Each structure stands twice: as C-alpha cells, then as structure tokens.
Amino acid sequence: MEIQLKNQKYIDSNVDRYLKQLSAVKSGERVTIDFSQVEYLRPGAVIQLIVLSKMFFEKSGEKVVWSGIPKDRAFYLRRLQIEQVEFISVMMPPMLWAYTRRDNETVIPLEKITNRPQLGCATAQAMDHLREWFPEESDDFCRDAANIVMEIVNNSLDHSERCEGNSPLCYYTIQKYQPHYPIGSKCYKPRVIIAFGDAGIGMRESLNRRWNIAQTDMSAIELALKGYSCRSDGEGGMGFRRVSEVLKKNKGHLTIRSGGASIHCVYDEDEVRRNRRYHKERLLGTQTAFLF
C-alpha cells in the first residue's frame, strides 16, 4: 500500500485522510509513505507521521517505508535523525557533502524517552540548547521551556505505561524557528517550537481512570487545560495549568491532539483564543506542540 502525502503546508492537519486507509492494511503488507510532493515539514507534523507509521506497523508487522523525500526535506529529517525510529525505514536521496542549505531553523535530533531518569537528562540538555540559541533571553525563558518538556514527557510516559502491550515511550524535539517577517519587524524575533508524541492511552482514558467525567476526547482536552489531575506520580496532573501560564507570559501557541479531537490555543496577555476540531478518525495517544 502506498500513501501519497499531498503538497500541503501542514501535513498534521490532514492526517485523518491517511488514517482511513489503516483498516485496509493486511498482516505482512508493506506500507510506503510517499513524500515527493511535500514542500514543508515542522516538528509537529513529523511527530504525527511517526505515530501514524507506528499504527501501520502494528497492523502489518512490517516497517513503514518513507520514500520519495525531496533533498531539502531529507536534510531536515537527517538533522532530526529520523532513521533511529525502529519501525520506519527511510529511503533518503543521495546527499552531496556540499548540500548544506542554510536557513534560519535549528533543530535537535529526535529524542526517544522511555523512563524518568532519562527525562532528567533530556531536560538538562534542553536547557543547554536554549541557552545557546537564545543568549539574549533570561534564564527564566529557558527554564519555562524546560518545564514544558518535563511536564509533557511525564504525561506521555504515564499514558504509555498504562497502555497494555506498549512500553513507555515519548518522542520529542525542539526547534529554533525564525518567522518569515522582514528584518526589523517586531514579529522577527526567533521563537522555539517543542513537539511531543506518544501512542499511549490518551487523555480521555487517563482522566477517566480517576475522575470518570470525560465523555469525549474534546472534553478530556478541555478538562486537562483547566488543570484536572490524573498522573499516577501525583506531581501536578497533566501540568497544563502551569504550562498555560508559561504560554500566556510568552504569548505562545499550543496545539493538542488526543484521539479524535484537537485544540489550537493562542495565548495573549488578556485572553486565550481556541480553535476546536473534531476528527472522524482517531490517532493513537496524544500529540502536543508548542510555539512561543
């Protein structure tokens, strides 16, 4: 089976179209995802494609092939070290040593975190990267971003541990991102993107193990944003109340998908604008992306 990723800016906004093909996959069938028409990738899209590939892998038992990758997208995926994902086989184009397309994006290799001691090291490394990328920012900014890493990865590990037959797992990456505004514009300031993904039980099942009040995936996300707790370690629930304060202070954006629902939040000093979306197909686990 071949899945053709269309020429679109945000792959993650249309992942449902690819999920529809999951039911047709047979055991032992090789699934190929064709990137030849893809012109743009961001960490959140890559994370969702990893989770999508995991779902196809679990159905077929065969590694999912990523093929037809344009050279500039291949360069980006190489920096992420996508080849370390064990259920994906990446068919990279030949790369000339001189092909070092310079741009304003800096990204750390994809991190695979499977336990909490490993999370401590990842958080410290995140602080180091942020201090290097944003030397003009205060330590509070770097600490805020590191706290987001700590809270969200803890959620993913907790959700994975509770998922039958699934080992604790969270993929995440951090990218320095330069918006495409004219130099000198007040919007030109570099920003940071942090993206996470797991294939665990998701927010609704996690919340209902303690509260039994989330009737839908959308209501579960809303409850988490209000600060409802569910994490088994007793350390602040899902941490979104704390995370929301960080985003409000930095006028950030938050996108969460869990199962069949997603919310995009834009934080300002005085308000939070939310765009809710219901999906016909359910993506495993929870995927979260931050921009601030």
Q: Where are the predicted features?
A:
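P-loop NTPase nucleotide-binding core
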Residues: 72-116
